[in-house]
Amino acid sequence: MQFIDQARITVRAGRGGDGIMAFRREKYVPAGGPSGGDGGNGGNVVLEADGNLQTLLDFKYKRLFPAPDGRRGGPNRCTGASGKDLIIKVPCGTEVRHLYTGILLGDLTRSEDLLVVAFGGRGGLGNAHYLSNRNRAPEKFTEGRDGEEWFLQLELKLLAEVGIIGLPNAGKSTLISVLSAARPKIADYPFTTLVPNLGVVRRPSGDGTVFADIPGLIAGAAQGAGLGHDFLRHIERTRLLIHVLDGGAEDPVEDLLVVEKELVAYGHDLVERPRLLVLNKQELLDEQHQDQLVDALQAASGRSLILISAAMGLGLEGLLAQVWKELGV
């Protein structure tokens, strides 16, 4: 399934039905009064979070969403039927903004959360509404009002507690695959991961914690280089970051600083987020080189370092123990 995390749509609420002019014309009612009914209200457009959806793919092919109009009023003071609300399903984690102003309308984070994004127009008034002591046969009635129409920006931010970040080819996808049931595409070249991968890792209590493998960052990502900040947004909601470094890289210390710089540049307090620093591919290092590299990375980051080999399954229990400690599990 194609992963789409941004969409632009137009929502158009229903128009209110017109009121009508009518008079009672019944046998034995020689002085029948006004009986024109009011129009029904137009339908609203409502977004609903659906926990079964993972992408905004549906909005790639359909972008206009009109709600039904209200029906016109009827004789005998009958009010027209109101238009049904149009319910649009979106994934949990969807932010909704006005397209041109950027104003945040809502953030649908839990399944069945609802957000009315366009209100239907009010129905018009029938002439029965204008009956008064001075005017016993009013001919006035009003048309229904137009519903609201808005251009919206939908933006999906994954609901993961733990985000796995690092430069391309650091081993993030391998790590999430061995920690969870996720099976991301894995190969030895940059940008294998082109979309975020989600995996559920079991806590000691048996409950699941969602981990997200975020596509590799590069220098300038916060300004849009490489895969850009299209996927940086997906770590905004995380409680903990796991920064994976490639132990076989030419200069892991420089790699560390590149990602640190991008987190600072992107903002949203990401650089202040609790973070575990992980050196992957431990099997590629001899003891002397490993000790030197650990000292250099800890000095550059001010953090302790966790050594693992995701491919060989080394150090994973210790890593998870630190994850649960940081999350307070």
Curated annotation (Swiss-Prot):
Segments forming domain Obg:
1-159
Provide the GO MF annotations for this entry.
ATP binding; GTP binding; GTPase activity; magnesium ion binding
What keyword terms does UniProt attach to this protein? ATP-binding, Cytoplasm, GTP-binding, Hydrolase, Magnesium, Metal-binding, Nucleotide-binding
Which residue range or ranges hold the OBG-type G domain?
160-328
- Record bears the keyword Translocase: no
Q: Which cofactor does it need?
A: Mg(2+)
One GO biological process this protein is involved in is:
ribosome biogenesis
Superkingdom per UniProt: Bacteria
Query: So what EC number does this one have?
Result: 3.6.5.-
Q: Which GO terms describe its cellular component?
A: cytoplasm
Question: Main subcellular localization, coarse class?
Answer: cytoplasm
Q: Is this entry keyworded Cell cycle? A: no
Binding residue positions for ATP: 166-173, 191-195, 213-216, 280-283, 309-311
What does the annotation say about its assembly with partners?
Monomer.
Protein name as it appears in the record: GTPase Obg
| Species in which this protein is naturally found | Prochlorococcus marinus (strain MIT 9313)
Q: What's the source species' lineage?
A: Bacteria, Bacillati, Cyanobacteriota, Cyanophyceae, Synechococcales
